[in-house]
Design a protein with these regions (language model features):
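Acidic donor-binding loop of glycosyltransferase active sites
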Residues: 68-81
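Catalytic binding pocket for nucleotide-activated donors in carbohydrate/polymer assembly enzymes
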Residues: 81-160
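Active-site-proximal region of nucleotide-activated glycan assembly enzymes
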Residues: 1-2
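Alpha-helical elements of Rossmann-like donor-binding domains used by nucleotide-donor carbohydrate transfer enzymes
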Residues: 37, 62, 69, 136-143, ...
């Protein structure tokens, strides 16, 4: 049995020439205390942001609109097999700061064992930065901001998760 990533529509999810001034926080099934830590962190730095919560639902067109104008995003997500909201952000060339998971038991409300997992299954250094523990938030955030212009997440998506490379792996 082989598993294959579903391709990202990089034609649909591509950057435009919008000025990149927005910040977003994407939350999906992580503990509310972790969410509050990130919100407090952003507030303490006087950073305005848009929040998208998977469980509380959001309108995709609002998310896409922010992605087109986002200078970076922060992901607070449980485990993902692929994570299309993350894939869309990266296809829009938005660098991400990810509070990654180690175990499926980190999903808030889930009843999983300590099965190894990740929030970002398809990732490399061009996509942004990630960390595992709350005490790493500030230093990892500072790294992301100090090197923000160097990230190329869209290039990673074009090379690995656009239609063509996914199709080639099927053959």
């Amino acid at each position: 049995i082989k598993s294959f990533a579903f391709p990202v529509d990089t034609e649909r999810f591509q950057p435009n020439n919008s000025q990149r001034t927005e910040v977003f926080l994407y939350h999906k099934r992580r503990h509310p205390n972790e969410l509050e830590q990130v919100k407090y962190f952003l507030k303490s730095r006087q950073i305005d942001y848009h929040i998208f919560d998977y469980v509380q639902r959001y309108h995709e067109e609002n998310y896409i609109n922010i992605l087109q104008k986002a200078k970076y995003g922060i992901i607070l997500d449980a485990h993902e097999s692929q994570g299309f909201a993350i894939e869309e952000a990266l296809s829009y060339n938005v660098p991400l700061l990810v509070w990654n998971t180690r175990f499926m038991s980190q999903e808030h409300g889930g009843r999983y064992e300590n099965i190894p997992c990740s929030s970002i299954g398809y990732w490399d250094e061009r996509c942004g930065e990630y960390f595992y523990d709350a005490d790493q938030l500030e230093s990892t955030y500072n790294t992301l901001l100090s090197t923000l212009e160097s990230y190329q997440p869209r290039q990673h998506r074009l090379e690995n998760l656009s239609v063509e490379p996914c199709f080639q792996r099927l053959n």
